[in-house]
């Protein structure tokens, strides 16, 4: 799947120490992610971006969430039921 590491570019926008290495993504921990607009490239990456956005400092906007909708119906509602501050904006 040629786009499977596209999410790495997105988390780098947040300040993550990350890179791709052939068939692997290498991500090192940092103290705090800074919010930035990011784009979902597939179902799992999109869900991961939303979850990481919950701990990022500031407001995170995730675009192309239709990918998430395909695999996780009621994703936003489920996160809200767990106490997450997340909303869908049209």
From Swiss-Prot:
GO terms for cellular component: cytoplasm
A molecular function GO annotation: UDP-N-acetylglucosamine 1-carboxyvinyltransferase activity
Keywords, in A-Z order: Cell cycle, Cell division, Cell shape, Cell wall biogenesis/degradation, Cytoplasm, Peptidoglycan synthesis, Transferase
Annotated compartments: Cytoplasm
Keyword Cytoplasm recorded: yes
GO biological process, one term: regulation of cell shape
Catalysed reaction equations from the record: phosphoenolpyruvate + UDP-N-acetyl-alpha-D-glucosamine = UDP-N-acetyl-3-O-(1-carboxyvinyl)-alpha-D-glucosamine + phosphate
Disulfide bonds: none
SUPFAM superfamilies named among the record's database cross-references: EPT/RTPC-like
Annotated metabolic or biological route of this protein: Cell wall biogenesis; peptidoglycan biosynthesis
Main location: cytoplasm
EC number: 2.5.1.7
Coiled-coil segments: none
Family in the record: Belongs to the EPSP synthase family. MurA subfamily.
Function description: Cell wall formation. Adds enolpyruvyl to UDP-N-acetylglucosamine.
Entry protein name: UDP-N-acetylglucosamine 1-carboxyvinyltransferase
Source organism of this protein record: Mycobacteroides chelonae (Mycobacterium chelonae)
Organism taxonomic ancestry: Bacteria, Bacillati, Actinomycetota, Actinomycetes, Mycobacteriales
Name of the encoding gene: murA
């Amino acid at each position: 799947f040629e786009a499977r590491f596209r999410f790495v570019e997105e988390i780098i926008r947040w300040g993550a120490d990350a890179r791709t290495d052939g068939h692997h993504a290498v991500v090192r921990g940092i103290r705090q992610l800074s919010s930035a607009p990011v784009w979902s490239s597939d179902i799992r990456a999109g869900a991961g971006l939303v979850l990481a956005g919950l701990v990022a400092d500031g407001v995170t906007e995730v675009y192309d969430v239709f990918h998430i909708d395909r695999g996780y119906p009621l994703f936003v509602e489920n996160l809200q039921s767990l106490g997450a501050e997340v909303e869908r904006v049209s």
